[in-house]
């Protein structure tokens, strides 16, 4: 990994942590709060690509594991990984990877701005919502004893906000691609 890669992954880890400074919004009927940090996960995948995006998320989760209060609401420590929300945290890694993987394959410099933006949006939707929810809902249903259907239905309240986050990530991805393309070169 080059110095540039290290700096970029550390930068996006810091962005994800900074998004955690925004207070979480609890819905009350499901133990998972609405946070801005999933936007950081989508942005890491869209801007950095699969490998670097996943590494940025891993850095954040390592900071959580050693006890730093870097999650929304000032949460941190190993106990977080035993909570009902742990599946979403693990899903961050795979969500960033899939978002980045799809971004690397769907977006190229020869496309129009609209096609690039839509491609980034699709990548963020699939990686940052579908993949993330697959991990989070499955773990939540198992650990909280809600059952898959109840966990799934309860999680649907987060979809509108996550779609907005995917739009923001797509617009950011397009802006970065125009000004300073960071996505790894395709083979």
Curated annotation (Swiss-Prot):
InterPro entries xrefs: BioY (IPR003784)
Gene3D superfamilies reported for this sequence: 1.10.1760.20
Induction per the UniProt record: Expression is repressed by biotin.
Membrane topology reported for the UniProt record: Multi-pass membrane protein
Keywords for this protein: Cell inner membrane, Cell membrane, Membrane, Transmembrane, Transmembrane helix, Transport
GO CC term, one of those recorded: plasma membrane
Disruption phenotype: Mutant exhibits lower biotin uptake and has a diminished capacity to form nodules on bean plants.
One Pfam family named in its UniProt record: BioY
Subcellular location: Cell inner membrane
Family stated for the protein in its record: Belongs to the BioY family.
Self-association state and partner proteins as the record states: Part of a biotin transporter complex composed of BioM, BioN and BioY.
Stated role: Involved in biotin uptake.
Name of the protein: Biotin transporter BioY
Organism of origin: Rhizobium etli (strain ATCC 51251 / DSM 11541 / JCM 21823 / NBRC 15573 / CFN 42)
